[in-house]
């Protein structure tokens, strides 16, 4: 790409709203931005007194700029977010946590509805409550629902195949509708009260339980009255420690804390007048140090992205003013088709909520900084242990997991001075011929990993750690030498020491040196942490691969079962165990399975 002349470009740049894309020498997109006036915004990048280190580094790599004129600043904002999500430019602030919020789901289409954890696309025939700030908040609420209202949480296949009550009934967390211990009418009443409770109408539920209890006592149904009394007491206990009341409506409170290039953003969630909790985000700031710029980028990606969160707050309280607040508010109103208010100058309760969110952000930052300092100290201890003249900033560790050679998986986990870099983790499905040979599997995985890193000019580790003894370490060192990386990558094996006791692991180096640092050594603690994570990641990958293969291989052996029928069977029953317990008539209920195929399936599983 030819040299870029900013002066010539700016002479012909439109003075209208739009989006700009900054390109490098290979045509890759470095940065995507929006502007009310494209010429004025782009001109600001090429001034002599630019203070931002990030901006100066960006400008030094620009070889071309492409622009798209839009009808308004709102359109520019929406297009900008679409391009950032698609292209993930290296100089844009990126929201790394793109996981959708969890909900509680009641399957209203079932004869005996179940109450479950849900994340993702909403399905017809179900009622949803939330969103909740975290999975733990959902599980806590579900535990409370089961304790008070005793509704089922089991899968449909498990429910259909019960012949006697399960443990949930024995510990008074389910009324056992699977075996007819509760009438459909009574169960429906419990589900309705559970839904009302989740909707925040706990007072109404308590009043209803009190009325039912008095009626049962008057009818001399003392066992039923005692059960209702216990339910009422549980709800009253919840009400005493109920979430803080905040008035009606849905709103989010957003606060930011920055320090040493790190940003922490807290989102305090208030739904139906109750503070449900908060969620912490750590956006990749890409060197940006302007708090308002980071906050604006976060808000745009968080609220304008395609997250599956149908509940949109009618008010968003901010800890500070952001430059594009008006355009963001208009974009939200356009996308959500309702009035939305962004506010930062507030009083009374709202000011207290902002203070609460800011306090959470400060606490999260303090915790994060302490963890980073601890990790950095461990890296320094490792450098001292290895007598390294070069800093160690990145460690990659490999481990192999298989069951007697079946479906072997190699894991590669990555750590730097900030901790685990899970976005850089990789699995490698090992060639079946090498599956039972840990040495061959390890060699294959390491070779594939670093051949690709070389090809893509990616980041190499400073230390390659291998879970295993001297033999595994030597195989890893062999591959590093083959790829001519021995001058830049240190290789180390970590295995059980002579005593085979935890904390007395032996470290093996290519030079033949062996070390046993001892259980108090900080460097060993770091290596143990990395090794244990590699082991966990490999085991998780192996179990998933083995389970998938066993499910598919068993069904694939049955005549007449192709991909569509296999998927329908697994969706309906959940697994092979449930299929083995199913009757021919139950197989016939599966979409796409006729009576003849149902009998074939039954005969196959009962050979």
UniProtKB/Swiss-Prot annotation:
Q: Which InterPro entries match?
A: GIY-YIG_endonuc, GIY-YIG_endonuc_sf, GIY-YIG_UvrC_Cho, Hlx-hairpin-Hlx_DNA-bd_motif, RuvA_2-like, UVR_dom, UVR_dom_sf, UvrABC_protein_C
Keyword match Protease: no
Q: List the disulfide bonds.
A: none
Any one cellular-component term (Gene Ontology): cytoplasm
Top-level division of the source organism's lineage: Bacteria
Compartments it resides in: Cytoplasm
- Give residue spans, biased composition: Basic residues: 542-551
Domain (GIY-YIG): residue spans on this chain: 15-93
One GO term of the biological process aspect: SOS response
The UniProt entry, under SUPFAM superfamilies, shows: C-terminal UvrC-binding domain of UvrB, GIY-YIG endonuclease, RuvA domain 2-like
Keyword Heme applies = no
The segments labelled Disordered in the record are 542-561
Pfam families (UniProt xref): GIY-YIG, HHH_5, UVR, UvrC_RNaseH, UvrC_RNaseH_dom
Record keywords? Cytoplasm, DNA damage, DNA excision, DNA repair, Excision nuclease, SOS response
Q: Which CDD domains would you find in this protein's record? A: GIY-YIG_UvrC_Cho (cd10434)
The main location is cytoplasm
Q: Name one GO molecular function term.
A: DNA binding
Domain (UVR): residue spans on this chain: 203-238
- Family per similarity comment: Belongs to the UvrC family.
Q: What does this protein do?
A: The UvrABC repair system catalyzes the recognition and processing of DNA lesions. UvrC both incises the 5' and 3' sides of the lesion. The N-terminal half is responsible for the 3' incision and the C-terminal half is responsible for the 5' incision.
- Assembly and interactions? Interacts with UvrB in an incision complex.
Provide the protein name.
Answer: UvrABC system protein C
Q: Which organism is it from?
A: Alcanivorax borkumensis (strain ATCC 700651 / DSM 11573 / NCIMB 13689 / SK2)
Q: Gene encoding it?
A: uvrC
